């Protein structure tokens, strides 16, 4: 009888011990689970952070793009006064006094397009101007004096000193415009509709 009573008393103790063991296992598992990062939550946070970070970058890119896209492209009809960065008419003497031989600087040309005025080797204004709009996707192409060429910052197209395309993806040379100095010294642009002297072909912009 004593043995039976002892066994009966021990049974509840074992059951309690088993329950405690299970409870402890659940607690440990919960603790470990809380320490392991939830991949779904991490992915969501990464997307949020990426989206937030992309906003200022996107705005910057848009601002940059807008700077290089001109208001229009191609030539116009009739003569038009060339204008400087402030919108003032350009006079030949004043321009030559501040621009050296070989200089290529932007002015406002036909239809308001950015157009290069060229100073020749003998110190006069060249008889033609170059529309600065890239023939690929319309970026304004800077003149790189150190390399004696125009290089597009958008997709790498290049043009020689006369605006002839020498490297793509631009398919065509820069558009030409006649450039003349009037009797009063005013510099004017007019449409170039003759053969393109650089290629021997009809002007694609006319």
Swiss-Prot record:
Domain Rieske: 92-188
Compartment(s): Plastid, Chloroplast thylakoid membrane
Required cofactor(s): [2Fe-2S] cluster
Disulfide feature: 139-154
Residues passing through the membrane, by range: 48-68
Transit peptide: 1-29
InterPro entries, per the entry: Rieske_2Fe-2S, Rieske_2Fe-2S_sf, Rieske_Fe-S_prot, Rieske_Fe-S_prot_C
EC number: 7.1.1.6
Annotated catalysed reactions: 2 oxidized [plastocyanin] + a plastoquinol + 2 H(+)(in) = 2 reduced [plastocyanin] + a plastoquinone + 4 H(+)(out)
Any one cellular-component term (Gene Ontology): chloroplast thylakoid membrane
GO molecular function: 2 iron, 2 sulfur cluster binding; metal ion binding; plastoquinol--plastocyanin reductase activity
Binding-site residues for [2Fe-2S] cluster, renumbered to this chain: 134, 136, 152, 155
Cofactor details (free text): Binds 1 [2Fe-2S] cluster per subunit.
Source organism superkingdom: Eukaryota
Family designation: Belongs to the Rieske iron-sulfur protein family.
Reported function: Component of the cytochrome b6-f complex, which mediates electron transfer between photosystem II (PSII) and photosystem I (PSI), cyclic electron flow around PSI, and state transitions.
More details: This protein is 1 of 2 subunits of the cytochrome b6-f complex that are encoded in the nucleus.
Protein name in the entry: Cytochrome b6-f complex iron-sulfur subunit, chloroplastic
